[in-house]
Amino acid sequence: RVLVLGRTPELCACPKHATAQRALEGLTRAIGKEFKKGMTSQVVYVAPGAEDQIESTVRFFLSAKSAYVSAQVVRVSPSDTKPAIDWSKPLAGKTALVTGASRGIGEAIADVLARDGAHVVCLDIPAQEADLQRVAARIGGSVLGLDITSAEAPQKIVDHFKGKGLDIIVHNAGVTRDKTLANMTPQQWGLVM
């Protein structure tokens, strides 16, 4: 990981300093492009007064969570709010809804959100109820068996979270067909979309 911290170019009083800071973007993009797979490069512009507010950004870019994020420019500005964060459970107290949570990518997303402290509501079609129950039980989540393509699904989701709140939605549900577009029937295409 290459993480370059610089000053916000527009806030530099001297044109030479501003130019040098602006060049960091090109440098990190070039590094990001030339490095081999598995390596990343970012620049974080830190405005004066925000030096004590970069921890979450630095932690993210130095973690495995940023493995596919490279050659990005992030700006950190001062803020009056400094929330206390439990870095072992950064999503503690949050509620997440993951659609398509009974297996595959949805299950993995539910695992990560739960690992990070969120209560995960696992949603999938009723036909996947057994797998959905298994995932929810393993991660300490809850189940919402529902076909999100049904006309009543939006209202059922609203009703489920009414008075409870919802902080995170990961809409992962989908249907894949191992066919080329030319070989798909209109019905198969409709399911995918």
Report each predicted region and the residues it spans.
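Glycine-rich nucleotide cofactor-binding loops and adjacent beta-alpha elements
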Residues: 1-90
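Rossmann-fold scaffold of SDR-type NAD(P)-dependent oxidoreductases
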Residues: 3-6, 42-45, 99, 166-174
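Helix N-cap/beta-alpha junction loops of NAD(P)-dependent oxidoreductase domains
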Residues: 11, 176-180
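Cofactor-binding loops of NAD(P)H-dependent oxidoreductases
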Residues: 46, 144-146, 179
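Canonical Rossmann dinucleotide-binding motif of NAD(H)/NADP(H)-dependent dehydrogenases/reductases
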Residues: 88-121
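Conserved glycine-rich Rossmann-like NAD(P)H-binding loop of the short-chain dehydrogenase/reductase
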Residues: 118-134
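The beta1-alpha1 cofactor-binding region of Rossmann-like NAD(H)/NADP(H)-dependent oxidoreductases
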Residues: 144-156, 186
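Substrate-binding pocket helix/loop in short-chain dehydrogenase/reductase
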Residues: 180-181, 188-189
